[in-house]
From Swiss-Prot:
Expressed by the venom duct. Disulfide bonds join C51-C57. The modification D-tryptophan is found at W53. Its target is unknown, but this toxin may modulate voltage-activated calcium channels (Cav) or calcium-dependent potassium channels (KCa). The keyword Nuclease does not apply. The keyword Disulfide bond applies. One of its GO terms (molecular function) is ion channel inhibitor activity. Exists in two forms, due to cis-trans isomerization at 51-Cys-hydroxyPro-52. The cis conformation is the major form. This is Contryphan-Lnv. The lineage of its organism: Eukaryota, Metazoa, Spiralia, Lophotrochozoa, Mollusca. The cysteine framework is C-C. It holds the Pfam family Conotoxin.
């Protein structure tokens, strides 16, 4: 189950990062807020709680 949750979080984070490349999304949200706030807005999960066990979150 833990691996499934990790896979879902990783795939969702990749989708969020992919959305950041779209011009419409870039116009709606500043790029400075994209790295810190995108996951919090789309996943409703604080990025700080993911980082300790997800070294690839940056």
């Amino acid at each position: 189950i833990l691996l499934l949750v990790a896979a879902v979080l990783l795939s969702t984070q990749v989708m969020v990062q992919g959305d950041g490349d779209q011009p419409a999304y870039r116009n709606a949200v500043p790029r400075d807020d994209n790295t810190g706030g995108a996951s919090r807005k789309f996943l409703n999960v604080p990025r700080e709680s993911e980082c300790p066990w997800r070294p690839w979150c940056g």
